[in-house]
Amino acid sequence: MTRKPYPSDVTDDEWAFVAPYLLLMKEDAPQRDHELRAVFNGLRWIIRTGAQWRMMPNDLPPWYTVYQQAQRWIAAGVFEDMVHDLRALLRLVKGKKEQPSAVIFDGRTVQSTPESGERAGYDGYKRKKGSKIHIAVDTLGLLLAAYVTPANEQERAQIKELAEAVQEVTQNSVEVAFVDQGYTGDDPKNDAKAAGIELIVVKLEEAKKGFVLLPRR
């Protein structure tokens, strides 16, 4: 690499891990005009900066090359495979089983931008317009699944999608999901049960206000 590096550039160790997932065709294939690592660095720059595709710096591959390759990677599911294997590796390093038996469901509202379009909704509880990200993580905080809705969608209504998603990526290993009080009610409980998961609501102590540490999960 002859250009000045960007903070978003992949390190040598990171590249050694991700490269096998990204090789949809040989690195020296005749139709490849740019090094694969340079294309991946272009994608990382876009993700890190949040800039428009057409604002890609001139010392990175053309924006349309990076965009088209990113679409191929997404269609091939390489990022899901990458996250799945990395999560399993990190769990084994921590002395845990490869797949979790307990997970955590939660949701977070993200402020909208002009580009949000129809995805934006109004979260009356948090008084914020935007999108709501519903996520599932294991007890180490490693991502299992994510689902995006308008901010006005309630967390409890997304249990079905999250429960089915985590069972798919963990080969049906999950038995318990911990949630906060935003997931109370029979519907979310039954939706989780249909996927073979027991939903456990962790309640805050009513007498306490402000920051409260929930029981260890």
Residue map of PLM features:
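Short alpha-helical elements
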Residues: 1-217
